[in-house]
């Protein structure tokens, strides 16, 4: 990045106009502030410093520090990382279409994208990739970053992979033509029971709304009469996608969200009345990992009394960023406004400019204070507001659910925590899958596979594997954590063999938050009732 570009970012020298992404249609001009101290400093360093200095590196260090002094969500994204960030929200990227893991310094194909380039070329789950374009690719050089660099590439370009198949020694070679690989933001859509549809939204990207319409159409074919939208651990994305999604469920002219900032006049987003599911009973699931666009959707449903929010208090991100790209491919995301739910609340949790440590540890603090386990431990840090029918809601720290569901810690032991945190469960699940792939591939649905895995006593097999790999067997703890261990182990095996939807359906079995939603529908209580007036 040339010196003048660095100065543009740091001190605001005029370099042109950058267009915001989906957060706003307005243009943001970076103008000369009149202060040239940093500009002069960098010129002096470049001209006079005793040793040669990489000015670009200085700038890459300085920009994040400057933005960190504004708020926790104004960030700098290097040119190296910008494409991956864009791909995640765009909904697709160009590559070969495999999901892989690295075991013993070798790429192992974990899953192959259905109808993707790799599958069309003949790559199978379980294959080991040992060379790329005729050059060996094993050993210490194999990292996630390097593997992604070699496998991704422009659409219609070719890459030749050398593969060793399970049970064979001879290397097979496959030439793959790279293509567009979808990154779906909706990872599951199926029926929980004969009346209730379920949709899991992983993130809010460019394709979320059309994906939602497809999912709803599929559920309509099964005559669903109520709907669960699962936003747990959905960290957000494009505001417009959340607005479009909320519009499907709201009657005409209902405020969905509004945004306002020092240089951004208030902008309202309202429903147009064309949504196809305005009277459908609805429950929305959230937790501490639900942020940003997830909170916009949940807030719109809650403040308009359109459905029931179930789970735990959401993250609390109420700031709107505008994305500004630079010619070298890097970009910044600058906070330009706050967003407000229909009742007028900003759900941004408190922060101190320049101090990200406390902000980033907020979720841990909530856990330690008992908020994950008791609704009484929730501390509302903002003022009270009221929904359309007069229910009390709070700003200043996320969306508090209408129905609280504590985290289930039954069976939690130090053995389970070590097994989960060490990565041993993931390693065992992949090894088990690899060793039993022919048999596992014969199962056509999640339920039959899960029943088979229970019969195989995968927990006992894992305990033996873990003991050989540094995690001492603790029989009493293993018995106490048996249900948790079985769920984690078998879910990963199911994921390795099937897909996101099968994995999601499995982990949702006996999920207390899902069960609470089904209970709400059974009692016909999805639409909130007006609070009684105390006399």
Predicted features, each with a name:
Residues 2-18:
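Hydrophobic membrane-insertion alpha-helices, especially the h-region
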Residues 21-34, 38, 42, 46, ...:
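Cleft-lining beta-strand/loop regions that shape enzyme active-site pockets
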Residues 126-128:
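Structural motif
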Residues 132-133, 164, 335, 350, ...:
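Residue-level recognition of conserved beta-strand edge/terminus positions
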Residues 293, 305, 312, 316-383:
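Polar, glycine-rich mid-to-C-terminal structural blocks
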Residues 49-110, 156-188, 508-518, 525-533:
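Extended, small/polar residue-biased N-terminal targeting/export presequences
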Residues 346-347, 351-535:
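Conserved functional hotspot residues or short segments at active or partner-binding sites
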